[in-house]
């Protein structure tokens, strides 16, 4: 244990712990990325986790708390597992407390070649007396059996979905049963967004969120929680750390009449997003049926601006039936017939948009 696990700072004894979760190493993510993009993403996540361990040790952290789902499945490649174990061995002064989550399986904890600074939790409550901190956790423990000394700083690791009461699944956590158990900090994993809540008069609970988003449903900065114990208190701070971020950018295209003009506006809107990040543009507003945004062309022209680009077209057509009352062209007849059909307005717009593209000689976007 490093420096007797404590340091004197302005006459206050303190320790520094890092809480992370949901790294999901080796996640396939084939539904999000093309094959090469998925491989690049997996390398980036492993690189970020390695950087976190190195940063923790370099900046004087006493321990890294992993609250579940370090790996995405129990079929993680041997190469990735060995990388992680070698990483831990390379930082012997940093204690690693690893709680397996619902994705991890038991492959890692069953190995015989674990480094000496890696500490794991069983199914029931497992306790570690770590300097001024008591660390407890379990993969499926009975909350009623939790016993923590009131005079200590107590940190508990659990993985699952918090529920208010009643019976839940194996990976559900009852807040009510953990109240008044002398918990100072409840380090949670399972949700991929940072959240914090008051546990009781003494303790707080935090989901650290994932270290890097896994799709456009996990946009925004991701990272870890820094814990500092000062005079038997726990201070916590969320620290953004992900090297790559998912962004969703809504953009009103009303009034834009050409693809180059719209492309220029979108480049300006997204100019502050790093090229290594992932971006989804959501186009909104009303557009002239004669010149709707050319999504495929925009996708092609802007693709090199980000590691991954998706464009979602949520625009609606600005159609006034009176404009086509006396139009004797094929286009006018087509629009009148569609507007007179029993289809709902959304389906009518889709049909008209496809039809107009076909009439212009373009490939319809079905």
Region locations from a protein language model:
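Extreme N-terminal starter segment of soluble prokaryotic enzymes
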Residues: 14-18
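Conserved beta-sheet core of the metallophosphoesterase superfamily
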Residues: 168-233
């Amino acid at each position: 244990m490093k420096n007797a696990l404590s340091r004197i700072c302005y006459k206050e004894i303190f320790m520094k712990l890092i809480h992370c979760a949901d790294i999901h190493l080796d996640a396939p993510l084939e539904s999000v990325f093309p094959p090469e993009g998925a491989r690049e993403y997996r390398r980036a996540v492993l690189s970020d986790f390695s950087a976190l361990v190195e940063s923790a040790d370099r900046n004087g952290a006493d321990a890294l708390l992993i609250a579940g789902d370090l790996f995405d499945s129990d079929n993680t490649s041997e190469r990735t597992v060995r990388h992680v174990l070698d990483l831990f061995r390379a930082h012997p002064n940093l204690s690693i407390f690893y709680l397996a989550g619902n994705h991890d399986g038991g492959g890692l904890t069953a190995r015989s070649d674990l480094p000496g600074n890696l500490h794991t939790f069983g199914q029931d409550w497992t306790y570690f007396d770590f300097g001024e901190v008591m660390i407890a956790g379990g993969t499926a423990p009975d909350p009623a059996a939790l016993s923590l000394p009131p005079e200590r700083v107590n940190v508990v690791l659990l993985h699952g979905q918090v529920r208010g009461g009643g019976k839940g699944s194996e990976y559900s956590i009852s807040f009510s049963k953990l109240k008044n158990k002398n918990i100072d900090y409840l380090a949670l994993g399972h949700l991929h967004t940072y959240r914090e809540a008051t546990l009781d008069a003494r303790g707080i609970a935090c989901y650290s969120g994932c270290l890097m988003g896994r799709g456009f449903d996990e946009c925004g900065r991701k990272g870890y929680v820094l814990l500092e114990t000062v005079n038997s208190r726990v201070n916590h701070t969320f620290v953004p750390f992900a090297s790559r971020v998912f962004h969703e950018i809504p953009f009103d295209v009303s009034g834009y009449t050409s693809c180059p003009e719209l492309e220029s506006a979108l480049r300006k809107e997204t100019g502050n997003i790093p090229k290594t990040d992932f971006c989804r543009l959501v186009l909104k507003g009303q557009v002239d049926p004669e010149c709707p945004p050319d999504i495929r062309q925009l996708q092609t022209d802007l693709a090199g601006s980000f590691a991954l680009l998706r464009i979602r077209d949520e625009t609606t057509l600005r159609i006034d039936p009176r404009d086509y009352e006396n139009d004797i062209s094929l286009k006018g007849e087509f629009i009148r017939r569609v507007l007179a059909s029993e289809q709902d307005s959304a389906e009518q717009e889709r049909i008209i948009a496809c039809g107009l593209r076909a009439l212009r000689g373009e490939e319809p976007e079905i």
